[in-house]
Amino acid sequence: MQNSQDYFYAQNRCQQQQAPSTLRTVTMAEFRRVPLPPMAEVPMLSTQNSMGSSASASASSLEMWEKDLEERLNSIDHDMNNNKFGSGELKSMFNQGKVEEMDF
């Protein structure tokens, strides 16, 4: 007579033999690496700063970025003040407190 451990292994072998007939095949999608689209490099991470590891180089790059940002914000303010797309009227209505009179 076989011991219980041998019987357990015999059952497992039978299940393993039956398993391939009951399995389904699943097709998996294949993913490939693709290059990233070209993007503008952030001024703080530019190659010029990585070559010169001084803090002043990165600070000047940051200052240039902030100056450019300030110029763009000033340009937006200028456009708003010159009534581009009616925003000048909207701003004056808000400043005068005539929000209730506004017709949307």
UniProtKB/Swiss-Prot annotation:
Q: What's the gene? A: SML1
Which GO cellular component does the record give, naming just one? cytoplasm
Q: Can you say where in the cell this protein is located?
A: Nucleus; Cytoplasm
PTM statement from Swiss-Prot or TrEMBL: Phosphorylated by DUN1, a downstream effector of the Mec1/Rad53 checkpoint pathway, in response to DNA damage. This promotes ubiquitination of SML1 and targets it for degradation by the 26S proteasome.
One Gene Ontology term of the biological-process aspect is: mitochondrion organization
Q: What else is known?
A: Present with 18800 molecules/cell in log phase SD medium.
| Superkingdom of origin organism | Eukaryota
Q: What is its main location?
A: nucleus
Any keyword Acetylation?
yes
Signal peptide, first to last residue: none
Q: What name does UniProt use for this protein?
A: Ribonucleotide reductase inhibitor protein SML1
Q: Spell out the subunit comment.
A: Homodimer; disulfide-linked. Interacts with RNR1.
Function in brief:
Strong inhibitor of ribonucleotide reductase (RNR1) and is involved in regulating dNTP production.
- Kindly list the GO molecular function terms attached to this UniProt entry: ribonucleoside-diphosphate reductase inhibitor activity
**Region (Disordered), start-end ranges:** 43-62
The PTM Phosphoserine maps to S56, S58, S60
Q: Where does the record place the modification N-acetylmethionine?
A: M1
Q: What is the lineage of its organism?
A: Eukaryota, Fungi, Dikarya, Ascomycota, Saccharomycotina
Name the keywords, alphabetized.
Answer: Acetylation, Cell cycle, Cytoplasm, Disulfide bond, DNA damage, DNA replication inhibitor, Nucleus, Phosphoprotein, Ubl conjugation
- Extract the coiled-coil ranges from the record: none
